């Protein structure tokens, strides 16, 4: 008789609400802290995962504080502070270029409605570019000094965000999953949408319509061919 293999669990978690989420700014790579509501969302996520019997072998996280703080809260609630955590710029949010830090209506007044909104509609459309000497540009931030400057964005389409994370997904995350490791990935809405795209085989048009809520664990159960057999929110 063939032994029935348990599905492999993978959890994707968007960070809790940030101050700029609350105030409706384009955030991107802006390093913004959690709001009080976001801290509560992270606590709730940790309790939900613990109550549902989840545990993890390793965690992945972006370089941005709102994701890092969310992960720290979840790990504390679950008693998993000892776990190794892989932090990488490749899991950072999509870069919103010259829109970063702006509210939508201010951006529309400055850049026009189509230049502002096309990147919210089209998979291959990027926001207006930052100038290379802009202090918001990752090339001017010491934390990214070790990254090849040619790989650091001045703005990103969703297609470019997918291309940024794909090497990490294919060369690091998927091999861990193939070994049966239970992973928690804490990141950002647009970045997580590109992971969902690869997991579920969605099109660019489909992920542009997808929404991932702050602080709600998105759980996958994968067979040993890494095909999702179950997908649900806690």
Curated annotation (Swiss-Prot):
<feature type="active site" description="Tele-phosphohistidine intermediate">
    <location>
        <position position="15"/>
    </location>
</feature>
<dbReference type="InterPro" id="IPR029033">
    <property type="entry name" value="His_PPase_superfam"/>
</dbReference>
<feature type="binding site">
    <location>
        <begin position="93"/>
        <end position="96"/>
    </location>
    <ligand>
        <name>substrate</name>
    </ligand>
</feature>
<feature type="active site" description="Proton donor/acceptor">
    <location>
        <position position="93"/>
    </location>
</feature>
<dbReference type="InterPro" id="IPR013078">
    <property type="entry name" value="His_Pase_superF_clade-1"/>
</dbReference>
<feature type="binding site">
    <location>
        <begin position="27"/>
        <end position="28"/>
    </location>
    <ligand>
        <name>substrate</name>
    </ligand>
</feature>
<dbReference type="Pfam" id="PF00300">
    <property type="entry name" value="His_Phos_1"/>
</dbReference>
<protein>
    <recommendedName>
        <fullName>2,3-bisphosphoglycerate-dependent phosphoglycerate mutase 1</fullName>
        <ecNumber>5.4.2.11</ecNumber>
    </recommendedName>
</protein>
<dbReference type="GO" id="GO:0004619">
    <property type="term" value="F:phosphoglycerate mutase activity"/>
</dbReference>
<feature type="site" description="Transition state stabilizer">
    <location>
        <position position="188"/>
    </location>
</feature>
<feature type="binding site">
    <location>
        <position position="66"/>
    </location>
    <ligand>
        <name>substrate</name>
    </ligand>
</feature>
<comment type="subunit">
    <text>Homodimer.</text>
</comment>
<comment type="similarity">
    <text>Belongs to the phosphoglycerate mutase family. BPG-dependent PGAM subfamily.</text>
</comment>
<comment type="pathway">
    <text>Carbohydrate degradation; glycolysis; pyruvate from D-glyceraldehyde 3-phosphate: step 3/5.</text>
</comment>
<comment type="function">
    <text>Catalyzes the interconversion of 2-phosphoglycerate and 3-phosphoglycerate.</text>
</comment>
<keyword id="KW-0312">Gluconeogenesis</keyword>
<feature type="binding site">
    <location>
        <begin position="14"/>
        <end position="21"/>
    </location>
    <ligand>
        <name>substrate</name>
    </ligand>
</feature>
<keyword id="KW-0413">Isomerase</keyword>
<dbReference type="InterPro" id="IPR001345">
    <property type="entry name" value="PG/BPGM_mutase_AS"/>
</dbReference>
<dbReference type="GO" id="GO:0006096">
    <property type="term" value="P:glycolytic process"/>
</dbReference>
<keyword id="KW-0324">Glycolysis</keyword>
<dbReference type="InterPro" id="IPR005952">
    <property type="entry name" value="Phosphogly_mut1"/>
</dbReference>
<dbReference type="GO" id="GO:0006094">
    <property type="term" value="P:gluconeogenesis"/>
</dbReference>
């Amino acid at each position: 008789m063939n032994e029935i293999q348990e599905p492999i669990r993978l959890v994707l978690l968007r960070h809790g609400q940030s101050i700029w989420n609350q105030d409706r700014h384009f955030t991107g790579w802006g390093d913004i802290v959690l709001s009080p509501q976001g801290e509560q969302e992270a606590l709730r996520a940790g309790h939900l995962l613990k109550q549902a019997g989840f545990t993890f072998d390793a965690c992945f996280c972006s370089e941005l504080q709102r994701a890092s703080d969310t992960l720290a809260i979840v790990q504390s609630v679950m008693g998993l502070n000892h776990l190794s955590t892989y932090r990488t710029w490749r899991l950072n949010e999509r870069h919103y270029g010259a829109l970063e830090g702006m509210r939508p209506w201010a951006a529309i007044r400055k850049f026009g409605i189509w230049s502002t909104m096309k990147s919210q509609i089209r998979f291959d459309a990027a926001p207006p570019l930052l100038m290379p000497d802009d202090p918001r540009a990752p090339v001017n931030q010491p934390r990214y000094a070790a990254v090849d400057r040619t790989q650091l964005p001045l703005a990103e389409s969703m297609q470019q965000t997918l291309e940024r994370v794909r090497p990490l997904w294919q060369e690091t995350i998927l091999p861990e999953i193939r070994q049966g490791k239970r992973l928690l990935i804490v990141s950002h809405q647009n970045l997580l949408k590109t992971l969902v795209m690869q997991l579920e085989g969605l099109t660019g048009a489909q992920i542009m319509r997808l929404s991932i809520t702050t602080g709600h664990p998105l759980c996958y159960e994968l067979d040993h061919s890494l095909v999702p057999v179950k997908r649900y929110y806690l």
